[in-house]
Curated annotation (Swiss-Prot):
Residues 249-256 are annotated as: Promoter-binding site. This is RNA-directed RNA polymerase catalytic subunit. Phosphorylated by host PRKCA. It comes from Influenza A virus (strain A/USA:Phila/1935 H1N1). The keyword Repressor does not apply. The gene is PB1. GO terms for cellular component: host cell cytoplasm; host cell nucleus. Influenza RNA polymerase is composed of three subunits: PB1, PB2 and PA. Interacts (via N-terminus) with PA (via C-terminus). Interacts (via C-terminus) with PB2 (via N-terminus); this interaction is essential for transcription initiation. Interacts (via C-terminus) with human PKP2 (via N-terminus); the interaction competitively inhibits the interaction between the RNA polymerase subunits PB1 and PB2. The lineage of its organism: Viruses, Riboviria, Orthornavirae, Negarnaviricota, Polyploviricotina.
């Protein structure tokens, strides 16, 4: 379809067209191969930014460490990580002066959270470095493996189920002389297949015990595994991201809880709120600066960009901040919070998979694992890789690189925001003591700075002072990438402000379309996305109507469920036509059963089953919503489900959609081939977990067992429930005395077994 693009813009104000320049249609770029090179880049760059710091050696692991704190003040505009402790502490003190009691109150809130948080908090999250297997696993599995190893090594505080007790075990584990772990390994052998008489490779999974000495265990506990960040748009080069292990995660969570609590109280912080709430917060700051810049004052805004925010931050600085913020708090609390930054200043970066070599002439491929990079002859590598390896070699231990300075991506978003806001806070006239003053917004590494002054020289002086203040705290504003405008036009975290926020619709484009979960969820998510964009993103009625028609078309092609009276032939058309002919009320058929689409922009909030219920034939209703239908493995459905939406950039968003259980809410069955891999153990654990949950549900039919509260275990809860129920049933005559006695006997046997365990 040829569209003359200029026609699109005839009636559109220029600022609304900004979103069409974004690279957000089509598939985002994904990375292939190993992330080893990107990780080495990160490690080398981080050390380069701090190169004039002091070198020391970690006494426990022998890792060389670079400490740039209180290092030489920069003399040029190159990025550097030499934060000055006294400056950071002073910035914190001024932040507290402007917000009396902010740290105190946040500490009290955090202490409550620390005492209540369950260890299952750590099961949230995707891939996690599993130190027992030395590779990534889903968070829940990694946690289960860690706890299993802890218990077999005599660390049992975690059995209370509280996160803080699990962390006590982590601390304890670091003092042990050795830790015994169970690792999985694959045996391959060539055997002759009886049927085909061909030779085949048979894989079996073995488990074996392995002892780690204190040094090896510490290295693993302090390791961050690295991967390549996928699906980043608008970038030529990929970059590495880190995933920490279970030892670090709990401590980071508590630090971020404190920092989040502080950010909520700071008007300049763009975190932890999002969406419309964030826009309102930002608009307030802008309004304040505009109204206070009287007719005599000029007001300018910088759309800011910081160079390599993470790589110039320093965990030692975070330790100083935490020490200051918690200074009047109980000793145990200060200790818990200071462990995360201490672990990060001793962190090790795992270099990933290593390099793949292939010889074209001999048709050979071989993998050089990261562990070998320390000793392999460099003649096999090209020039740039050779330089990287030479540079990183002094830092290598057991295939990981010592990385003391810098923070890996996304670890301390909240805490680093507090640091950024503390500089914005210094812009008040009572601190600048001159005619210029500033304010702004900070969200992790993104910032917008609003400077007011009587004349242009004042604006320039204000920006310079801000720039130099940032340098003292290890923040490097990029002079190349930041730009300044009259206040009223700027961009912050992909929100475009032009006398108010302009909808950046292109960011939402990737979430339109069919998600591919199942017929029921996809229909629901599809219409919800359109509805949400009408509410939040200026999606007009005509465009929404068109989006809806395109979505239905896309949906029908995806699930091959064209209307029963169509001419289109697909694999499903025979069944769909048959159903169409048998159905009296054709409007009642779901779109996924070849029915017509009854959605329009007025009824997007109603689930399709509800929309068509009154129009359905009775036997169709019975088949559609029958939990006993043998052809469906049913998902237990809550009234709301969550879909993970990937906006064009920024973190994945959770989107709620209505979930009505029908025979279309199927879950795809697991692929058999998983049973032959090292993941098999995980599968068995999952099934075990599933059986336990089913059993638990039989005792507590209405339960949602995801978050057990209180310290008693599932077994204790079931036993006491059985005893109570049995007594009630016996007293009301529903069961006989013999049955009652038998139940009580079984219960006491279980309790006895628990005690012996």
């Amino acid at each position: 379809m040829d569209v003359n693009p200029t026609l699109l813009f005839l009636k559109v104000p220029a600022q609304n067209a900004i979103s069409t320049t974004f690279p957000y249609t089509g598939d985002p770029p994904y990375s292939h191969g190993t992330g080893t090179g990107y990780t080495m880049d990160t490690v080398n760059r981080t050390h380069q930014y701090s190169e004039r710091g002091r070198w020391t050696t970690n006494t426990e692991t022998g890792a060389p460490q670079l400490n740039p704190i209180d290092g030489p003040l920069p003399e040029d505009n190159e990025p550097s990580g030499y934060a000055q402790t006294d400056c950071v502490l002073e910035a914190m003190a001024f932040l507290e002066e402007s917000h009396p009691g902010i740290f105190e109150n946040s500490c009290i809130e955090t202490m409550e959270v620390v005492q209540q948080t369950r260890v299952d908090k750590l099961t949230q999250g995707r891939q996690t470095y599993d130190w027992t297997l030395n590779r990534n696993q889903p968070a829940a599995t990694a946690l289960a493996n860690t706890i299993e190893v802890f218990r077999s090594n005599g660390l049992t505080a975690n059995e209370s189920g509280r996160l803080i007790d699990f962390l006590k075990d982590v601390m304890e584990s670091m003092n042990k002389e050795e830790m015994e772990i169970t690792t999985h390994f694959q045996r391959k052998r060539r055997v002759r297949d009886n049927m085909t008489k061909k030779m085949v490779t048979q894989r079996t999974i073995g488990k074996r015990k392995q002892k780690l000495n204190k040094r090896s265990y510490l290295i693993r506990a302090l390791t961050l595994n690295t991967m390549t960040k996928d699906a980043e748009r608008g970038k030529l080069k990929r970059r590495a991201i880190a995933t920490p292990g279970m030892q670090i995660r709990g401590f980071v969570y508590f630090v971020e809880t404190l920092a989040r609590s502080i950010c909520e109280k700071l008007e300049q912080s763009g975190l932890p709120v999002g969406g419309n709430e964030k826009k309102a917060k930002l608009a307030n700051v802008v309004r304040k600066m505009m109204t206070n810049s009287q007719d005599t004052e000029l007001s300018f805004t910088i759309t800011g960009d910081n160079t390599k925010w993470n790589e110039n931050q320093n965990p030692r600085m975070f330790l100083a901040m935490i020490t200051y913020m918690t200074r009047n708090q109980p000793e145990w609390f200060r200790n818990v919070l200071s462990i995360a930054p201490i672990m990060f200043s001793n962190k090790m970066a795992r270099l990933g998979k290593g390099y793949m070599f292939e010889s074209k002439s001999m048709k050979l491929r071989t993998q050089i694992p990261a562990e070998m990079l320390a000793s392999i002859d460099l003649k096999y590598f090209n020039g740039s890789t050779r330089k990287k390896i030479e540079k990183i070699r002094p830092l290598l231990i057991e295939g990981t690189a010592s990385l003391s300075p810098g923070m890996m991506m996304g670890m301390f978003n909240m805490l680093s925001t507090v640091l950024g806001v503390s500089i914005l806070n210094l812009g008040q006239k009572r601190y600048t003591k001159t005619t210029y003053w500033w304010d702004g917004l900070q969200s992790s590494d993104d910032f917008a700075l609003i400077v007011n002054a009587p004349n242009h020289e004042g604006i320039q002086a204000g920006v310079d002072r801000f720039y130099r203040t940032c340098k003292l705290l290890g923040i490097n504003m990029s002079k190349k990438k930041s730009y300044i405008n009259r206040t009223g036009t700027f961009e912050f975290t992909s929100f475009f402000y032009r006398y108010g926020f302009v909808a950046n619709f292109s960011m939402e484009l990737p979430s339109f379309g069919v998600s591919g979960i199942n017929e029921s969820a996809d229909m629901s998510i599809g219409v919800t996305v359109i509805k949400n964009n009408m509410i939040n993103n200026d999606l007009g009625p005509a465009t929404a109507q068109m989006a809806l028609q395109l979505f239905i078309k896309d949906y029908r092609y995806t699930y091959r469920c064209h209307r029963g009276d169509t001419q289109i032939q697909t694999r499903r058309s025979f069944e769909i036509k048959k159903l169409w002919e048998q159905t009296r009320s054709k409007a009642g058929l779901l779109v996924s059963d070849g029915g017509p689409n009854l959605y329009n922009i007025r009824n997007l909030h109603i689930p399709e089953v509800c929309l068509k219920w009154e129009l359905m034939d009775e036997d169709y209703q019975g088949r559609l919503c029958n939990p006993l239908n043998p052809f469906v493995s049913h998902k237990e459905i809550e009234s709301m489900n969550n879909a993970v939406m990937m906006p064009a950039h920024g973190p994945a968003k959770n989107m709620e959609y209505d979930a009505v259980a029908t025979t279309h809410s199927w879950i795809p069955k697991r692929n058999r081939s998983i049973l032959n891999t090292s993941q098999r153990g995980i599968l068995e654990d999952e099934q075990m977990y599933q059986r336990c949950c089913n059993l638990f549900e039989x005792f507590f039919p209405s339960s949602s067992y995801r978050r057990p509260v209180g310290i008693s275990s599932m077994v204790e809860a079931m036993v006491s429930r059985a005893q109570i129920d049995a007594r009630i049933d016996f007293e009301s005559g529903r069961i006989k005395k013999e049955e009652f006695t038998e139940i009580m006997k079984i219960c006491s046997t279980i309790e006895e077994l628990r005690r012996q365990k």
